[in-house]
């Protein structure tokens, strides 16, 4: 196992009115490791994930991500993605009325020399992404035409393709 640290959370604390949701939480993730957060409802699992992904602002502590100078404190979800943190949630967080290819590349569409979306390249790259996961589907079809389980796999494919350092799966197989 590689000993290279990609993520460190130190002293993360967060309080909701009347409830200490996180109390001085420390967490270290090394390259290649797989972790599972387990606990009862209300134990703080989702809150910790939301702090890491920029959804919740934590009150105390620091988050360090490999290759980023200094601590990452109360960053946004976009900052988290730019720093290599990808998340797939239990609820599919994609656009059902867009094609699979559009969903895979939303916000990072390949462009032509003229600055317009390069649809041919997007479709070709989308087919390659899905083929890498042994999924032979028509990427030009709208996401809503596929089962919820397949939509979840497409969300996972998108997260993996974003060249992430940390991939968080928040109950992604529940559907």
Give the residues covered by each predicted segment.
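Glycine-rich phosphate-binding loops of nucleotide-dependent enzymes
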Residues: 1-175
């Amino acid at each position: 196992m590689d000993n290279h640290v990609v993520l460190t959370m130190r002293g993360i604390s967060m309080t909701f009115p009347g409830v200490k949701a996180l109390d001085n939480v420390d967490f270290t993730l090394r390259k290649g490791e797989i972790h599972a957060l387990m606990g009862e409802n209300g134990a703080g699992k989702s809150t910790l994930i939301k702090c890491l992904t920029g959804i919740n602002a934590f009150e105390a502590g620091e988050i360090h991500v490999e290759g980023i100078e200094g601590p990452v404190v109360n960053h946004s979800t976009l900052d988290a993605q730019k720093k290599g943190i990808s998340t797939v949630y239990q609820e599919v967080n994609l656009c059902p009325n867009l094609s699979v290819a559009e969903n895979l590349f939303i916000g990072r569409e390949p462009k032509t020399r003229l600055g317009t979306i390069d649809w041919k390249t997007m479709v070709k790259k989308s087919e390659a992404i899905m083929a890498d996961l042994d999924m032979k589907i028509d990427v030009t079809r709208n996401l809503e035409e596929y089962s919820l389980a397949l939509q979840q796999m497409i969300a996972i494919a998108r997260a993996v393709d974003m060249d992430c350092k940390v991939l968080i799966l928040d109950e992604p197989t529940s559907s």
